[in-house]
Amino acid sequence: MISESEKLAEFAAAVRNSTIKRLKQVPAGKENWRITPDAMSIAETAYHIIEADEWLIEKIENRDLEPMQGKTGTVKIDNNVEFRELIDRLQQSGERRCSFIRELDESRLLSTIFDKRFGKEVTIWWIIVRGNLDHEIHHRGQLSAYLKPLN
């Protein structure tokens, strides 16, 4: 029987692969494009997803960790090679996230942590699914929408 952590890791890998698929469709020279001046660029969004992976792992180890926010001005891509390197970092970050999730046993997934984003104690399972995977899916939807006017 497949464990819950294995199922979550498989889902996390599928989410990441889909995100990377979208990023690879970004036309060269459009990596820093943003829909509005105050919005994160495509590259900043990719970087933000990497930060969210790192935050997830740290939050589970450091229960007092404050929520993170995506920011503009974190990344500026000068050429397509740099963007491919950012995508590679995103792939590696996703692999680390999957390995981390796979190592969580059932009791750990069901343990609770206070998460300010939700205003209450939630399970680690909830932090992974709602706080990280759903968050990435949200940004992947943005990326999909951004691709339409760029292509």
Residue ranges and their predicted role:
Residues 1-6:
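Basic/polar N-terminal segments that are highly enriched at the extreme N-terminus
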Residues 9-13, 17-23, 30-74, 115-151:
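Short, contiguous alpha-helical
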Residues 29, 102-119:
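Acidic catalytic patch
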Residues 17, 21, 92-99, 103, ...:
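A generic structural signal for well-ordered alpha-helical segments enriched in polar/charged residues
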Residues 59, 64-101:
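Helix-adjacent hinge/juxtasegments
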